[in-house]
Amino acid sequence: DRLRSRGLGDVYKRQQFAYRYDTQLLIDRRDRDLDEDEIADYITENFEGNSLIAAGDEDLVKIHFHTNEPWKILEYCNTVGEIYDIVVEDMIRQAAGQQG
């Protein structure tokens, strides 16, 4: 593959992903009055990224966000409530056929 032999394939993949890490987690809301819209607004206003989903039911709020700094999202969400089922996947590695 000509692109791969020159290293341009990696450059192309990096350009496809403005935000490298797919960050997903759940926040336990059983003991707290959490508003997923307020959480989404805070994330949007304070962190760089895209593809935000903040949705929930009476027990939890699910967060999904693409960012280059997933630890900041985890740190913030941990101040809001107990976080669990944390998944951080490297989308560039996944696009290259590797484990994310």
Predicted segments, located by residue:
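Conserved short beta-strand edge segments in small beta-sheet-based binding/regulatory domains
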Residues: 52-54, 81-95
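Short amphipathic alpha-helix segments
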Residues: 25-49, 74
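Long, charged amphipathic helices and adjacent flexible linkers at domain junctions
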Residues: 10-16, 88-100
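Charge-rich, low-aromatic oligomerization/scaffolding segments with amphipathic character
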Residues: 69-85
